[in-house]
Amino acid sequence: MDEERALYIVRAGEAGAIERVLRDYSDKHRATFKFESTDEDKRKKLCEGIFKVLIKDIPTTCQVSCLEVLRILSRDKKVLVPVTTKENMQILLRLAKLNELDDSLEKVSEFPVIVESLKCLCNIVFNSQMAQQLSLELNLAAKLCNLLRKCKDRKFINDIKCFDLRLLFLLSLLHTDIRSQLRYELQGLPLLTQILESAFSIKWTDEYESAIDHNGPPLSPQETDCAIEALKALFNVTVDSWKVHKESDSHQFRVMAAVLRHCLLIVGPTEDKTEELHSNAVNLLSNVPVSCLDVLICPLTHEETAQEATTLDELPSNKTAEKETVLKNNTMVYNGMNMEAIHVLLNFMEKRIDKGSSYREGLTPVLSLLTECSRAHRNIRKFLKDQVLPPLRDVTNRPEVGSTVRNKLVRLMTHVDLGVKQIAAEFLFVLCKERVDSLLKYTGYGNAAGLLAARGLLAGGRGDNWYSEDEDTDTEEYKNAKPKEELLKPMGLKPDGTITPLEEALNQYSVIEETSSDTD
C-alpha cells in the first residue's frame, strides 16, 4: 500500500508532495532489508518513477528524498533488474558530481545529494551484475578517483570521501581489471595513501617517520570510517604485490608501510572501531613486500633517548640491578629501536587468540605478518623472541599450560584447524631461528611433532633459512632440568623407517649439541 500511494504521488509530478510522501516512505522503511514479493512489481515501477523525477529541475531537498527511497529499494536485487540501465546510471553519476571534471565542490547545499547518490551507487553496484558491467563501460573507477582528488584535503566532506572510497572498494573487489587500472593507470596507490595521510593528519619528521602524539585526541568517527574504507580499497589494489620490481614501487610501499605504522599507534573513537582500524591495517601490511616492512621500526628520537637516560639517572648509582630492570621492562625499545608498532601487533595477536573463535579470519593474518617480519628483519625477530619466548624458567609445567603468550601459541600448535596450527608453529619455529632443539625446549616434542614431521626434521637439525649466531641463553633452571628433558628427545629414524636404537640416537644428539648452541 505504501508503494502504491508513493507511486501515485510521484507520477503526479508536484515536487512538494513528492518530497513529503517519499520522506514518509523513507522514515517507515529505513530499517527494511527484506521485502514482500507480492509488492515487487510496484517497487519496480516506483524506482522507474523516481528516476524520471530525478532528471527534472527539482529542489535539492526533493532530490535527497528521492535518492533516500531509491537507496532503500536498491537493497532488493529483483527490483534492480529492469531499472539498471546506462541512462539511469548516468543520472546517478551526474548527481554524485562524477561527470564534472572542473567542479570544485563549493556548493555545500549539494553535499547531501552527492552522498545519497554515492550510497545508491554502492547498493546498485553491489547487487546488480548489469551495474557492474556498466561501471566498466562508464569508466566509473576513474571518475571516483577524480572526485577523491577534489576532496582529498577537505575534512568537512568526509561523508563524500567515505562513500566514494566504499564504491571504489566494491569495484576493485568485483573486478580484477579495475584493480589493475587503479594500480597503474589511475595511480591509486599514492592517491589512497594520501587519503590515509589526510585522515590521520600525519606530520612527517623524516622520509618514513611521522610524529606521534600519544596524548592527542582519538580519531573522529568520520575520519575513522574514511580510513577504514581507504585501507580496504588499498588492500584490493595491492593484493597481488608480492615482489617489488622498481625503486619507485619500493619507495611507495615504504611510504604506505610508514602510514600504517602511524595507524597502529593511534586510536579510534571506540575500542571496537580501533580494533577494526588495526585489523584492516594488518591485512594491508600483509600485502606489503617484506623487504619494505623495515619502516615499522625506527631509531629512537633524541627526545626518546633523553627520556630513557633520565629514567635511569633518577635511580641511585648503586642500584645497578634496578637499572637493568628498567631497561628490560621497557617493552617499546629494543637495541636502540622504537618497537611500538611491533608491540601493538603482538598485543593485537594476543587479543585475537583470547577471543577463541574465527582464528582463520582473525588470527592468521597477524600471525603470518609477524612470522614474515621475524624471518626477514633481525631486530624484529629478536624483540619478539624476548617478548614471546623469554628465558625459560618454568620447567615444571607443560609448555601449553599457563596464560603467557608462549603458552597460548603452544596450545594453538595442536588446534583442529590445520592452517591455524601450521602458522602458530611456524611463528615459534622462526623465533627459534628454525632450530629443532630450541623449538623443543619451548614447546615440547608432542606439540612440535606436526611441524617437524612436515619438514622432515623429526631427527633434529634446523630449517633451511640462515640466521645470525648469538650467545647461549639457557637459564640455570633449564640447565638443571635438561638431563631429564633429554630423555624425551625424539628417536632417530633409519632409511627403512625403523627406529634407531637409543644408544645410537643419543650419540647423534650429542654430536648435534656439540656443534650448535641455543641462541638469542
UniProtKB/Swiss-Prot annotation:
Disordered, as annotated region: 468-494
InterPro entries: ARM-like, ARM-type_fold, Chaperone_Ric-8_A/B, Gua_nucleotide_exch_fac_Ric8
One Gene Ontology term from the biological process aspect of the record: sensory perception of smell
Source species, domain of life: Eukaryota
Keywords annotated in UniProt: Chaperone, Cytoplasm, Guanine-nucleotide releasing factor, Phosphoprotein
Positions of modified residues (Phosphoserine): 468
SUPFAM superfamilies cross-referenced by the UniProt entry: ARM repeat (SSF48371)
Subcellular location, record wording: Cytoplasm, Cell cortex
UniProt modified residues of type Phosphothreonine: 473
GO terms assigned for molecular function: G-protein alpha-subunit binding; guanyl-nucleotide exchange factor activity; protein folding chaperone
Database matches in Pfam families: Ric8
Signal peptide: none
A Gene Ontology cellular-component term: plasma membrane
Ranges of Basic and acidic residues composition bias in the record: 476-488
Family under the similarity heading: Belongs to the synembryn family.
Functional description taken from the UniProt entry: Chaperone that specifically binds and folds nascent G(s) G-alpha proteins (GNAS and GNAL) prior to G protein heterotrimer formation, promoting their association with the plasma membrane. Also acts as a guanine nucleotide exchange factor (GEF) for G(s) proteins by stimulating exchange of bound GDP for free GTP. Acts as an important component for odorant signal transduction by mediating GNAL (G(olf)-alpha) folding, thereby promoting-dependent cAMP accumulation in olfactory sensory neurons.
Subunit structure and binding partners: Interacts with GDP-bound G alpha proteins, GNAL, GNAS and GNAQ. Does not interact with G-alpha proteins when they are in complex with subunits beta and gamma.
Protein name (database record): Chaperone Ric-8B
Source species: Homo sapiens
